[in-house]
Structures are given as structure tokens and as C-alpha cells.
Amino acid sequence: MFLFICNTNYNMAAQGKAVVNKCGEKYMKIEYQENKNRQGILSVILKSLLIVTFLFIEILLLIGSVFEGKSVLVSNRMMFILGIIGYCIYLAFNRKKIPRSVIVENVGLAVSSLILLVVQLIIIYNIIFQTSWDVEAVWYGAHWAAIGDKLGLEQMSEYFSLCPNNLFLVVIFSSILKLNNMLGEPFSNGGLLLAIFQAIMINLAGLILFKCAKRFVTVANAWKIYFVYSILVGISGWIVLPYSDGMGVIFPILLLYIYIRIRECNGEVQRCGYILLLSVIAVVGYYVKPYTSIVFIAIIVIETTNWWKKLISNYSRTMLLTMMRNIVIGVITMVVCNTLILGMNRSVGFDLDKERAMGWQHYLMIGVNVESWGGYNDADLAFAKSFNDKEIRNKREMQLIVERIQNMGVKGCAELFAHKASKNFLDGNWGWGTDKSFYKEIYPSRSNGLCTYLRSWYYGFENLYCYNATIRQFIWIIVLIMIPFASFTLKTLQSEQKVLFLAVLGFMLYLQIFESHARYVFVFVPLFLILAFVGSENLKTLLNLFFQYKSEQK
């Protein structure tokens, strides 16, 4: 009897344990499915936002003359139609496959990059000119810093007190000019030397873009991305103006590439090294072009959601310690790098007044200016300069921001939003020649026929420029057409895809809120191109499925 009772109790305990285990397994499956659904929800949100955003942009393209560029030969509406026809022709004849040999890729990439650099040098040598606005200020600041001219530094102190965001660019450029002086000035034109250095950076960005693009599209499309990049960015007129726009191109794509490498590597030591590098590049990029940090912010957001899901579904002490280690490495690296850069900025020699520095309120105030449609305005700058106290200036600018929004009303805000979007994203030449005193000083023509042709092709007031502008605008419109199709997939977005989507959307939102200018998009063109070719691949897949379905119906 005793044995029977013990056996019965044992069986009941075993059954109870089995029930508990089944319940536990069921709970874990439900929790896992919920986590999976949450991950799917994030993908759906990003896809939907991308579609809505770029459909809005394409509606602006089709509106007509309200948002037309002045230098192109064909209307945006006609380019939109021609772009669709051109893509259909491309699909019909795009049958060639490119070999995947890494050696062939690297050799081809090196040769292509060398050819691009030679073309860039020819363009820079023949068309370089002196412009005004911030480019001129940075150039003179770097020049005076390189030769140690105290009077020149004193004269430029007011500008850099107002715009301290350009100080690190002066550090970089003045270092290059100092090296040129130490070598006996092999380059007598310092602006030419800086433009060449910038061209090299843009060239490196193209190499990184190709390597990065292979993680999102086929090798064949990665080559096409590189080719389009070479046209839109590599041989753009902006390469001859050494400034943060050209220097900043490398940072968004480099941040994305390093993030991909972090996710691909298996060794913890290697991963820590990449995290350290990512943190350094994020800080350097911020001091060269502040909004490049949007990519880094996107990485932080996506990785935070990833870690949170892992901790909920499969908590472990090791996982938590790994996360804390990565955070500590990143934070310490960024603090050290930030301290070093601030020290270098102070060492230049400008007499800076911190109370004169314009904060984010100033750029938000510009962003809601109806007169300039969110662009630079002399009156806004004069208003900001009239205050010597930072706190008072920020307060008055916030008051003016509220007043402008109230005066616009809902209809006015919508109109401003549309105008800013068209101004920011519909110009494939990125505002070339639109800034005040853009062609301030044009150097004497080189003694060759090519110089005359290139200047006519690039200078906005010459005869051939309209053809250059039209070609670039046409290519850019095709890019805009393709981007929404990047969302046309049933697959859940991978982490690197989420970062790409979020970074582009975040950047576009940034320009819609703060000061707008088409040339700001120049920095993010590599990310736009990847999205466009992802969309192209998705569209091609959808069309193939459609025609396959039609043939089966017959």
C-alpha cells in the first residue's frame, strides 16, 4: 500500500512537472512569437514610412512648374515619365551576369577608382574657382591658421564664434596646408590642394559604398551603384569646393559599413575594435558635418531594440555584461575623442566668444522662415548677431519660432513643408550656383581647349551647363522613383536594413525641421542610392512574379 501511494504520488508529480514544462514551453513560444511580431511591427513601420515619404516626394515631382529647377531643359513631370520608360528598357536588356570573384572585384574596383580620381583631378584643375559664404570663411581660417597670421585669425574670430561647427574643418585643412608649406609649397594654390584632398575622400567613400552595397544588393547592382555614384557625386561640381559637404560624404556610408562589420564578425576582440572605430568615426563625423551623426543615432536605436528583445526572450548575465561592456567602450571612446577634438579646435588660435555661438534654436528659426522657404536668410542672421548673450538670444529665437508657426497656421505650415521638401530633395544638382556670390572669383582659363569645354559644362551661367544639369536631374529622379520599392518585400528587415531605412528617414525629417538646402542631401546620396537599387531589385522580382502568374493563367 505504501509503495502504491508513493508510486501514485511520484506519477502525479511527474505529470505535474510535465504540465508545468508544457506550459513553460507554450509560454516561451508565445513570448518568442510576440517578440517576433514586435520585430515585424518595426519593419512594417519603417517600410510604411519610407513609402509614404517618397510617394509625397514623387507627388511634388508631378505637380509641375511650382517646384521646377531653372537650369534643366525638360520638366520634372516629363523626366518622371521618361524615367519609368527608361527603367522598363533597362529591365528588358539587363541580362548580363557579373562574376563574383573577389579578386576580379577588387582589381576592377581599384582600376575604376583610379580612373575616377584622374577624371576628378582634370575637372578640379580646369574649373576650380573661389566662392563666398562658408566655404570662403573656412578657407581663409585654414590659411591664416597654417601660416600663423594673428591678425587674420583675429579677423575670422567673429565668424567662428558664431559658427563653431566649422572649427574642426579648419583644423584638418590647416594641417594639410602646413604640410604643403613644409614641403616647399608644391601646390601654390592652397584651394586646389584642399579640393584634391576632398576628391580623394569622395573616392574612398565610393569604395566603401561598393563594399557596403554588396550586403544589400547583387554584385552587379553594387557596380551600378558605384557607377551612378561616380556620376552624381564623384564628378559633381561640388568636388571643387573644399567644405563640409564634400568632406562629409564618407561618414554616413562608413558608419553603416562599420556597423555591418560589427554584426558579421565573430570574435569579441574584433567586435570591440569595430565598436571603438564606430565611436571615433561618429564623433569625427559630427565635428565635420553634424547631421552625419543621424546614422549613428539610427544604429543606437536599432541595436537598443535588438538588445531589449534578446534580454526579454533569453536573459542571461553574460549577455547583460556584454552589452554593458560595449556601452562602456563606446562612451569612453567618444568622451576621449570629443576632448581631443575640442583641444585641437582651441589650439588653432581664434579668439572665440562662446556667448556668440548660434545654437539649434537659430537653425530651427531659419527652418520656419516662409520668406526663404526654410533656407538661409540675411535678416535671421542679423537678428541672431544682435544678441551678445546666448541665453537671451535662444529665448528670443524660440519666441520668434512660435510666432512664425502661429502666423502660418495649418495651411501655411503645410505649404512650407511642401516647399522645403521640393527644395531639399527634388534637385539633382543640389543647389549648385544658387548661393550668394557663388562664382566670386574665376581664375584665368588654362591654356587648353578642354578647360573651356569643362567650364561651359560646369559653370551655371555658361551654354552647356543646362545639359549637365538635365542629365543629373534625370538620374536623380529615377533614384527617387525606385526608393519606395525598397519597402516592397514580405521579408522582415534585417538590422542593417532597419538602420538604412531609419537613417534616411531621420535625415529627411531633420531637413524638414531645420534649415533646408539641397546641397545637404549631397552627403547622404550613397544611402539613397543603396535604397534605390534595393527597390529596383524588389520591383524586378514583383514584375517577374506577375508575368509568371499571367503565363500560368493561360
PLM region descriptions:
Residues L209-I231, S495-K498:
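Transmembrane-helix signature of polytopic, membrane-embedded enzymes
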Residues V217, L255-Y274:
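Membrane-interface transmembrane helices that cradle and orient dolichyl/undecaprenyl
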Residues V240-G248:
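Short acidic/glycine- and proline-prone juxtamembrane loop motifs at membrane-interface regions
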Residues L193-F216, L254, I481-F485:
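Transmembrane-helix motifs of polytopic, lipid-linked glycan transferases
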